[in-house]
Amino acid sequence: MSSDYQHIRFQVEDRVARITFARPPLNVFNIAMMREITAALSESARREIVAIVLAADKDCRAFSAGVAIEEHVQDTIYQMLDSFHAIFRQLEQIAKPVIALVDGAALGGGCEIVAACDVVIASDRSRFGVPEIKLGVFPPVATILLPLVIGEKRARELILTGEIIDAVEAGRLGLCNHVVPGPQLEPKLLEVTAKLRELSGTSLEFARRAMDLGRGRTLDEALSEQENIYLHELMKTADANEGIKAFMEKRKPVWRNR
């Protein structure tokens, strides 16, 4: 186990790496935490493993409630987006199967990480959504991945309305592979990882890379396009800045539609 992290825990056991989000109560991603997740993924790439598990610490009430709103302001927006998207670029680069173990809310950036995982095991109390539009912004990763995972029309509806869905609906849409009672999360995880341990880690990497290539363009290319819109167009609008400011001031935003 590595002890060099403050907001996560990292361990490798029986050819499976586990990255545990440990920033209670809601695992809100700040820049430091996101960089730690990327570092742990990079460390996983150097290990002979068959899978990576992403999960929340038992003391946390959510898988993740998303990226810290206070880091969406002009002073930190570039660092924030770069640090968050580095997670997804690293996931694509290492090409190892990734399993999300979700118990509680996976919202905003938390839901985007779920969408990027190969297998999602969720408790029946879990909730999912990308409510960024209510703050006057949009979720760049979700605009790329959600249509691929759950279909174009439903993805558009979730992104454009900010709707939160329960685990049953997430399972029906294909965002979750397995929805189980909370006590069955770890047993279901053991069942899935047992299947992967019987396989070649190298072959799993090639299979995952082949599926990524089948999308027609890399996630890195798609993210670069979204970053340009987000940073150089959206974040220069009055409404994007008003939405973030209103959230931090705990009031309703006053939209100017510009």
Indicate where each model-derived feature is located:
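A short acidic, glycine-rich active-site loop
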Residues: 73-83
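C-terminal alpha-helix plus adjacent terminal tail
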Residues: 1-14, 23, 44-47, 57-60, ...
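Crotonase-fold acyl-CoA enzyme core
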Residues: 2-4, 92-202, 237, 242, ...
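Hydrophobic/aromatic residues within transmembrane alpha-helices
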Residues: 19, 54, 68, 113-115, ...
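Short strand->helix junction
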Residues: 26-27, 62, 136, 178, ...
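A structural preference for short, pocket-lining loop segments at secondary-structure junctions
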Residues: 14-22, 32-75, 90-101, 119, ...
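Hydrophobic alpha-helical segments typical of transmembrane helices
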Residues: 83, 87, 141-145, 154, ...
